[in-house]
């Protein structure tokens, strides 16, 4: 038997077949980098467009500084800053009220921004804003994401807190604190005992002054009225001294000025009248009510009655001021006017409330108890 062997041409064809397959697969190798051609290689050269839905990673100070630096005159108005931020970052097209309020706050409170008034007076509204030359390099190498810590220049404190002036002003030599002037011991609010010194009562402060001492004549009148009140209390209400007590009430009270309530604090406790707040003797304790039908000295008459005419047989009318025969015989003749009637009238005229109390006490016998309690007030 003869063995059959394949022809060498077939073997060479079989050997060349895998090589052709490899050659066909080799052009596919550079295919993977081709999809990334648009995203990776040209990313650094083409400028990035910010995403409108994403907030820019810059502070409001950086946005303001960016807008001012990129302007032609290195200064912008508030509306110009708004327009630059909206054109640069579309994110700020919405919610304008919130971030624009923050821009205004940063312009006013940050020391890096200086307000420059417009030329030509107030013809156009709005001022220019520019950067302080001392804050030109507050961002490192133009990187607005990193801000350097700036050392703020020393600014003197306000006028009312300058060294050498107290919190309340004039101090050292006077020993107190005023509103104007300078002290020698620095800030006044650091020295607690200072405002307790005597000089604190200054004319510029609307504080009440201590009451002035009473006049000597008022003290004498008050003492005399107190003695008269004690005597009237011992003698009783029907004595002539009762009218003198009412007259004495008006004496010290009339001598007081508009600050009589303050001055009465300096009187002894027994001299202060607790009813009307004015100085004067206290009202005597009321005696027990008693029935009486005789007239008193305070019942004043216009004129004294003439003496009665002698009786005669003719039917003559009685003279004026005399009782008629039909009157009861038990009626007592009117008493003459007391010697102190003008003083009583003067006292009642000066203090109507005292006159009301006095007359109501004597005229109405049934209300004596209630009026006595009124006098004790």
Swiss-Prot record:
PROSITE patterns, alphabetized: FORK_HEAD_1, FORK_HEAD_2, FORK_HEAD_3
Assembly description: Interacts with ESR1. Interacts with UBE2I/UBC9. Interacts with SMAD3. Interacts with DDX20.
Bias (Pro residues): 305-322
Role, per record: Transcriptional regulator. Critical factor essential for ovary differentiation and maintenance, and repression of the genetic program for somatic testis determination. Prevents trans-differentiation of ovary to testis through transcriptional repression of the Sertoli cell-promoting gene SOX9. Has apoptotic activity in ovarian cells. Suppresses ESR1-mediated transcription of PTGS2/COX2 stimulated by tamoxifen. Activates SIRT1 transcription under cellular stress conditions. Activates transcription of OSR2. Is a transcriptional repressor of STAR.
Annotated segments matching region Disordered: 1-53, 277-338
Basic residues bias: start-end ranges: 291-301
Major place of residence: nucleus
CDD domains: FH_FOXL2
Pfam family for this entry, one: Forkhead
Cross-link position per record: Glycyl lysine isopeptide (Lys-Gly) (interchain with G-Cter in SUMO): 25
Subcellular compartments: Nucleus
SMART domains assigned to the protein according to its UniProt record, in alphabetical order: FH
Record's protein name: Forkhead box protein L2
DNA-binding region: 55-149
GO BP, one annotated term: positive regulation of DNA-templated transcription
InterPro entries: FH_FOXL2, Fork_head_dom, FOX_domain-containing, TF_fork_head_CS_1, TF_fork_head_CS_2, WH-like_DNA-bd_sf, WH_DNA-bd_sf
Lineage of producing organism: Eukaryota, Metazoa, Chordata, Craniata, Vertebrata
């Amino acid at each position: 038997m003869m063995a059959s062997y394949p022809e060498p041409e077939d073997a060479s064809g079989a050997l060349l077949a895998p090589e052709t397959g490899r050659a066909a697969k080799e052009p596919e190798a550079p295919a993977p980098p081709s999809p990334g051609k648009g995203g990776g290689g040209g990313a650094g050269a083409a400028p990035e467009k910010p995403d409108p839905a994403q907030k820019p990673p810059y502070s409001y100070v950086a946005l303001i500084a960016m807008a001012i630096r990129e302007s032609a005159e290195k200064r912008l108005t508030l509306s110009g800053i708004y327009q630059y931020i909206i054109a640069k970052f579309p994110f700020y097209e919405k919610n304008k009220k919130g971030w624009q309020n923050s821009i205004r706050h940063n312009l006013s409170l940050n020391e890096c921004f200086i307000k420059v008034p417009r030329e030509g007076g107030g013809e156009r509204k709005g001022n220019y804003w520019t950067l302080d030359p001392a804050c030109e390099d507050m961002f490192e190498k133009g990187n607005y994401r990193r801000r350097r810590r700036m050392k703020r220049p020393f600014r003197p404190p306000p006028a009312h807190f300058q060294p050498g002036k107290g919190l309340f002003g004039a101090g050292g030599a006077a020993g107190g604190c005023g509103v104007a002037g300078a002290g020698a011991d620095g800030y006044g609010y650091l020295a607690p005992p200072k405002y307790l010194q005597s000089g604190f009562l200054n004319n510029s402060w609307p504080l009440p002054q201590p009451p002035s001492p009473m006049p000597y004549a008022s003290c004498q009148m008050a003492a005399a009225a107190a003695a008269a009140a004690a005597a009237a209390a011992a003698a009783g209400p029907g004595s002539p001294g009762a009218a003198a007590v009412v007259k004495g009430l008006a004496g010290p009270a009339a001598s007081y000025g508009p600050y009589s309530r303050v001055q009465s604090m300096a009187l002894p406790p027994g001299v202060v009248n607790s009813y009307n707040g004015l100085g004067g003797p206290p009202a005597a304790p009321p005696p027990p009510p008693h029935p009486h039908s005789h007239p008193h000295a305070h019942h004043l008459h216009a004129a004294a009655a003439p003496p009665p005419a002698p009786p005669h047989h003719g039917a003559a009318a009685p003279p004026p001021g005399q009782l008629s025969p039909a009157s009861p015989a038990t009626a007592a003749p009117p008493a003459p006017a007391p010697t102190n009637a003008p003083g009583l009238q003067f006292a009642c005229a000066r203090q109507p409330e005292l006159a009301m109390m006095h007359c109501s006490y004597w005229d109405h016998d049934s209300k004596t108890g209630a009026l006595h309690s009124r006098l004790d007030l």
